[in-house]
Structures are given as structure tokens and as C-alpha cells.
From Swiss-Prot:
Xref: InterPro entries: NA-bd_OB-fold, Rib_uL2_dom2, Ribosomal_uL2, Ribosomal_uL2_bac/org-type, Ribosomal_uL2_C, Ribosomal_uL2_CS, Ribosomal_uL2_dom3, Ribosomal_uL2_RNA-bd_dom
PROSITE patterns referenced in this protein's UniProt entry, alphabetically: RIBOSOMAL_L2 (PS00467)
GO process annotations (BP): cytoplasmic translation
HAMAP family the UniProt entry points to: Ribosomal_uL2_B
Keyword Ribonucleoprotein in record: yes
Disulfide bridges in this chain: none
Subunit structure: Part of the 50S ribosomal subunit. Forms a bridge to the 30S subunit in the 70S ribosome.
Annotated organism of origin: Staphylococcus carnosus (strain TM300)
Lineage of source species: Bacteria, Bacillati, Bacillota, Bacilli, Bacillales
This protein's name: Large ribosomal subunit protein uL2
Keyword Ribonucleoprotein: yes
Length: 277
């Protein structure tokens, strides 16, 4: 999918880019795979704000995605590539030989009419899902499970991928995009290939209103708030934050502070940590 550039006929259009959606083959979603998606505006069930900068935006319906890829032995044909407003990647509608329809994340290079398979006997072909034990070393993969049968959790956004580095006993070594090398059970499933829509990260929003259409509200700097609203607030004019390191609105160290909880049971599965900036 290529980037579309606009003439600077208004200030909002200047430097603005968007995707040309050339890969999209169908605009109407499959009705049987839709669910209502009520707006929360960042509030929990008590009505309290728990996530900032959420609210407004266009009305959406949730597309039910098959992350488990557990329909083995029955081939499926790619019916269409569709846009999904709920994620950065595009989605592909599969029609199985028995008539069932399912959505999957569309990998790079997937074509309409292509046949897709799941299970241990599946070929090493883009879009096929099989256990890590059956995937050769060096293969690019995405939609990787962390626990067998739970469904893919890693490498699901646009352009994401990981690589199989080796096999040790019941574990498979996988290198993630962050540089982290992790051991994952060989019975966990993954999909062959890289997630499509690689140009997504290059899109220039261009104006604030376009973010509001997506349901993203403004992010106000702490330094322009009052001291009762943020640790960086207060002072006369453009005052410094007055602290040795930046703080979150709740007084916790941020911007570089590690947030992963210590002594997690999965720590022993991380062979090499992610790359430092």
C-alpha cells in the first residue's frame, strides 16, 4: 500500500499523507463477524477516568478476528482484504471449504484467491499457521502464541514480525522486533510471514481534527498545568520541572524508567533483553 500525498491547499493539508488503500478489495464488512463496540471514553464501570486522551471519534463496529487459527485440516480461500478501524493492520476474510467464514490479520503479500491452511501438516507459506516446532529456523513469523491455544499475542500490528532463531528441547528461540530473544513453547502456534500495511507508520496525520476522528483527545503538557494537577506544574512563566527526573501525573518516575514488574515467572524465558536506546 503506497502513501498518498496532498497539495497544500489548506494548512491542514500541508505535509499531510494517507494510505491509498490499493490493497483493499472490499469495503463492506462480513455482517456475521461484527460485534457492537460501545464507547468508553477512557472510563471504567464506575465512570471514573482510567485512561487519558480517549474520547469522541467515529462510530465503529468490532471485527471478530481469529487469532487462534485452530481450524485444522480444512483449507480456506482468501475472499477479500478489508480495512479494520480497530487496528493498524488490514484483515483478510477467509472462507473455509465447509462454508465457515473467519477474519485473520492480513500478512504482507497475501492475495485474493490464495489458499490458506492451519495445523501441523500446513506448508511453510505466507498466511499458513502451524506450531513453532514445525517452522524451520530463519522463518519470518507473526501472530505468535505465548501459551498453546490462547491465540496469538505477539507481532500483530502493521509491519510487525519475528524470526525463528533455533530450537532447544521443548522450546523455540524467537527474536522479536525489539531485539529481545525469547523462548516460547514449541506447541505454540504462529503464522508464517510479516504483517502487511508496512507504510502505516509513515502516515503524517497533518491536523488535530484527524486525531479526533480516531478518538484521540489532546495531550496537555504537565509543565503548563497547575501544581495541584501535575508534579511539573506551577512556577512563573516557562519554569523548569524542578525535579531530578520527569514524573507522571501521579508522581511516578517516567521517560526511561523501566515499568516491567520484577521477578515475573516468564523472566527465565527471556534469553536476551531488548535493545537499549
Amino acid at each position: 500500500m503506497a502513501l498518498k500525498h496532498y497539495k497544500p491547499i489548506t494548512n491542514g493539508r500541508r505535509n499531510m499523507t494517507s494510505l491509498d488503500f490499493a490493497e483493499i478489495t472490499k469495503t463492506t464488512p462480513e455482517k456475521s463477524l461484527l460485534q457492537p463496540l460501545p464507547k468508553r471514553a477512557g472510563r471504567n464501570n464506575q465512570g471514573k477516568l482510567t485512561v487519558r486522551h480517549h474520547g469522541g471519534g467515529h462510530k465503529r463496529q468490532y471485527r471478530v478476528i481469529d487469532f487462534k487459527r485452530n481450524k485444522d485440516g480444512i483449507p480456506a480461500k482468501v475472499d477479500s482484504i478489508q480495512y479494520d478501524p480497530n487496528r493498524s493492520a488490514n484483515i483478510a476474510l477467509l472462507v473455509y471449504a465447509d462454508g465457515e467464514k473467519r477474519y485473520i490479520i492480513a500478512p504482507k503479500g497475501l492475495q485474493v484467491g490464495q489458499t490458506i491452511e492451519n495445523g501441523e501438516e500446513a506448508d511453510i507459506k505466507t498466511g499458513n499457521a502451524l506450531p513453532l516446532a514445525n517452522i524451520p529456523v530463519g522463518t519470518t513469523i507473526h501472530n505468535i502464541e505465548l501459551k498453546p491455544g490462547r491465540g496469538g499475542q505477539i507481532a500483530r500490528s502493521a509491519g510487525a514480525s519475528a524470526q525463528v532463531l533455533g530450537k532447544e528441547g521443548k522450546y523455540v528461540l524467537v527474536r522479536l522486533r525489539s531485539g529481545e530473544v525469547r523462548m516460547i513453547l514449541s506447541t505454540c502456534r504462529a503464522t508464517v510471514g510479516q504483517v502487511g500495511n508496512l507504510q502505516h507508520e509513515l502516515v503524517n496525520v497533518g491536523k488535530a481534527g484527524r486525531s479526533r476522528w480516531k478518538g484521540i483527545r489532546p495531550t496537555v503538557r504537565g509543565s503548563v498545568m497547575n501544581p495541584n494537577d501535575h508534579p511539573h506544574g506551577g512556577g512563573e512563566g516557562r519554569a523548569p520541572i524542578g525535579r531530578p527526573s520527569p514524573m507522571s501525573p501521579w508522581g511516578k518516575p517516567t521517560l526511561g524508567k523501566k515499568t516491567r514488574r520484577g521477578k515475573k515467572s516468564s523472566d527465565k524465558l527471556i534469553v536476551r533483553g531488548r535493545k537499549r536506546k
